[in-house]
Regions:
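Glycine-rich, flexible N-terminal cofactor/catalytic loop recognition
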Residues: 1-61
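A contiguous loop/helix-start segment that scaffolds small-molecule binding in enzyme catalytic cores
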Residues: 5, 80, 159-241
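Short active-site oxyanion
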Residues: 29-35, 107-111, 158-160
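Alpha-helix capping/helix-boundary segments
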Residues: 41-43, 88-89, 118, 168, ...
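Conserved helicase motor
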Residues: 57-65, 138-143
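Glycine/small-residue-rich loop that forms an oxyanion/phosphate-binding "nest" at active or ligand-binding sites
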Residues: 68-117
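Class I SAM-dependent methyltransferase SAM-binding "motif I" and its flanking Rossmann-like core
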Residues: 98-156
């Protein structure tokens, strides 16, 4: 294996099945001077699977402002840092983008080692149109903010991809059904894992299904089909939901 050029390596990791790690990703993690990750416990399971001994540093929302300058300085000093998240592509719904941004501003070498993505995997498996799509991450836990976001995107003619928390799934599906209309959608849970589950149907059907089922567990992706002739509802109607 050839030595790495000093810089920041943004490395995708498996979203569930550890066997999905790419060969290049394994090589970069082995050769890097340091791995910056969200949860060291999660990342060490992956490293153990592939006998990787590289130093690990925790980098997450609560310490990012302190750790980020240290990582950038290490690269400036000639080091190589691999950035990973708990699952999937770093900087998607995590603080990774700020490290990438600041590294670029500092004139450092930045490259990506692609791989698994829960959002894209969910879109493909949903069976919904893939030619145009919009990824929105997690909707707000606050009801009104969540509805406002859904209102803003209600007329977009593209498949919509969300990450969702099991605690909020039913409420989010209810809001989607009322505001986006009864579009076709899919709820994808525990992708690539032993208990992978895909439920497809209209938003109304999915809302009813999960409202009368035990609370789901694990990581969830919701994909909603494109808008067609979406009937708008008034603010008064929304407030009664």
């Amino acid at each position: 294996m050839s030595p790495l050029e000093c810089g920041l390596y943004v490395v995708a990791t498996p979203i569930g099945n550890l066997g999905d790690m790419t060969l290049r990703g394994i090589e970069v993690l082995m050769l890097a001077d340091r791995i910056a990750c969200e949860d060291t416990r999660v990342t060490r399971k992956l490293l153990s699977r592939y006998t990787i001994k590289t130093k690990v540093t925790s980098y997450h929302d609560h310490n990012a402002n302190t750790v980020r300058p240290v990582l950038i300085q290490e690269i400036k000093n000639g080091g190589t840092v691999a950035l990973v998240c708990d699952a999937g592509m770093p900087s998607i719904s995590d603080p990774g983008y700020k490290l990438i941004r600041d590294s670029i501003v500092a004139g450092l070498y930045v490259t990506v080692v692609p791989g698994a993505s829960a959002g894209l995997s969910g879109l493909v498996l949903s069976g919904l149109p893939t030619d145009r799509f919009l990824f929105l991450g997690y909707l707000s836990s606050k009801s009104q903010q969540r509805r406002n976001t859904l209102e803003e995107i209600s007329g977009i003619s593209a498949s919509l991809i969300f990450h969702e928390n099991p605690e909020r799934l039913v409420r989010s599906l209810k809001d989607m059904s009322f505001i986006l209309g009864d579009r076709q959608a899919a709820v994808l849970r525990e992708l690539t894992k032993l208990h992978e589950e895909v439920c497809r149907g209209s938003l109304n059907e999915l809302w009813a299904h999960y409202a009368h089922s035990a609370k789901p567990k694990g990581e969830i992706v919701v994909v909603v089909g494109p808008a067609k002739d979406v009937e708008k509802i008034s603010d008064k109607e929304i407030s009664t939901i």
